[in-house]
Amino acid sequence: MSKTHLTEQKFSDFALHPKVIEALENKGFHNCTPIQALALPLTLAGRDVAGQAQTGTGKTMAFLTSSFHYLLSHPAIDDRKVNQPRALIMAPTRELAVQIHADAEPLAQTTGLKLGLAYGGDGYDKQLKVLESGVDILIGTTGRLIDYAKQNHINLGAIQVVVLDEADRMYDLGFIKDIRWLFRRMPPANQRLNMLFSATLSYRVRELAFEQMNNAEYVEVEPEQKTGHRIKEELFYPSNEEKMRLLQTLIEEEWPDRAIVFANTKHRCEDIWGHLAADGHRVGLLTGDVAQKKRLRILDEFTRGDLDILVATDVAARGLHIPAVTHVFNYDLPDDCEDYVHRIGRTGRAGASGHSISLACEEYALNLPAIEAYIGHSIPVSKYNPEALMTNLPKPLRLTRSRPGNGPRRTGAPRNRRRSG
């Protein structure tokens, strides 16, 4: 983490359990991010927290540190059974659940607390085998958690810590009934530590906090600057006919180390993938149609740097901790203005700088006023020279369902292109 992203507050300044301090120091975490510095004094005092912070500011480590400390500092109930986890962390997507689990593993290795993972799509028996051996902290998506609970593979009667991550996304995806179903099977709110984190805290999320938490304290980091100080935003107005060529020209001009291209539909994403793969880029595709194992593999390849570009719908826009994304391209302006914030929040993370480039085409330019009103500023407009756009581009590849994650390796030096004005 960059020093500019950290506070003077050190984890060792808090009365954290020694094993938690050891795990953090082993990972090189010494100073807190702003959200951690605000949340930890409250959770260590046993207070519930509803936290709002920009994506990439350390929300995950804030609730993981709090959860591990609480479980190490408070004994489990005397008659706790093997199918009763002590902490439940709920996430809106499988990818986010997997990421939280990965972030929690170093803490688990040092503290000895056992982790479980529960998400739909695949791995039912493998996940169940881990649960049957007993876990302290269960991380998962609501559908699979309810499935296991209804079959009595898990029992929530011994829960001491609850975390809701990306709570507003839970609403967007229609999971609120599932969340309430799970809460009804836990001890009362005043008998557990409750944490809720999200990049936005809407009225409906605050209502959920009021329902399911015990007088939660609200903490916010830079709420007035929704898009982040370190993200350079840029907007182009292409015609529909020039839109794809402009994207390809910008990618050649910027030559990003690691970029995400967002579009509003899976079919548009597949089309973009085909053009970029045919042009020699190492590009992956992430949509709801991609099988779960392939989605995780593609994310892993992108994180490792084996892929340079990820083309995605908003399934990948929330909560995923993909390091060192240098550029975000909004091929389509999103219909939901909150998604604009979450999309461009993929870059400029943990104190790094980032670049967001949006294309306001004839189809989606109508979304721009609402986006700019929501973020509180106008996005700077850049012009381009249509005559400088790339030409003679190869015919786009058609997606083959057996290999949606791989394009050719991009080779050669970037082709220099210049914008006008």
Swiss-Prot record:
It catalyses: ATP + H2O = ADP + phosphate + H(+). A motif (DEAD box) lies at residues 165-168. Pfam families: DEAD, Helicase_C. Residues 403-414 have a biased composition (Low complexity). A motif (Q motif) lies at residues 9-37. ATP binds at A53, Q54, T55, G56, T57, G58, K59, T60. GO terms for cellular component: cytosol. Residues 393-421 are annotated as: Disordered. Gene3D superfamilies: P-loop containing nucleotide triphosphate hydrolases. SMART domains: DEXDc, HELICc. Its EC number is 3.6.4.13. CDD domains: DEADc, SF2_C_DEAD. GO terms for molecular function: ATP binding; ATP hydrolysis activity; RNA binding; RNA helicase activity. DEAD-box RNA helicase involved in RNA degradation. Has RNA-dependent ATPase activity and unwinds double-stranded RNA. Component of the RNA degradosome, which is a multiprotein complex involved in RNA processing and mRNA degradation. Belongs to the DEAD box helicase family. RhlB subfamily. This is ATP-dependent RNA helicase RhlB. It comes from Citrobacter koseri (strain ATCC BAA-895 / CDC 4225-83 / SGSC4696).
